[in-house]
């Protein structure tokens, strides 16, 4: 144990077909595969508990994680267009890391520019932000807060093989700053075609007000490119606060970030 501070693992999601021209089955297959990341972390956590010191825990590093679509081949530089589907998957992964922040100490998407689940794309003199960039920008509002356990109640969706169960419609992470009496909630609606009414309550700390940012598109295969760099961008959206509870409707294949003032 004295020789180990961290252990690193990789996880790629490769069952989603092509980057843009994917089917509904491809969509759900890739989204469902991303849940394996939570299984990876849970298994590592169970193993590491046998070796953790009294005040010193082995840190888990996910040093490469990404969607990897079938047309992202080495001869093409592993480039793939990143769509709203990728953003929903990225949000789910980042929520997972937040929920496991007592064990996960560092993560790194593969990669930052042009490769697989990148946040910036460059083509000659043109550069633009992918939908993934905005998910990272939203989730950073958790930084400096205390992670909170999220008790989520939502329907399960059909898997890529048409089976039901095992894929929660919502992915959620939450955090709070007790001194500032503020909270942050990130929610991804994984359903490819249906919205969902979302209600959020901070146990013992009713919400006073909230602001919301929404990353949403009409089609799950929407993406940004040089000729349309702003097709997928976040926008402010309405959120109601009633008796300390947040209420909002989340469109299909969307990611929302709620900044909350608590009583």
What are these regions (language model features)?
Residues 1-35, 58, 63-67, 104-105:
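Aromatic- and acid-rich polysaccharide-binding/catalytic face
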Residues 7, 44, 64, 107, ...:
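Conserved, mostly hydrophobic/aromatic
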Residues 33-52, 57:
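Gly/Pro-rich turn-and-neighbor structural signature
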Residues 47-51, 93-97, 124, 170-175, ...:
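Generic recognition of flexible, low-complexity loop/linker segments
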Residues 57-172:
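Aromatic/acidic polysaccharide-binding cleft in carbohydrate-active enzymes
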Residues 166-206, 212-215, 253-259:
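Carbohydrate-binding surface patches
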Residues 205-246, 250:
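Acidic, Ser/Thr/Pro-rich beta/coil linker or hinge segments at domain junctions
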Residues 245-263:
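Beta-strand-rich recognition/accessory modules
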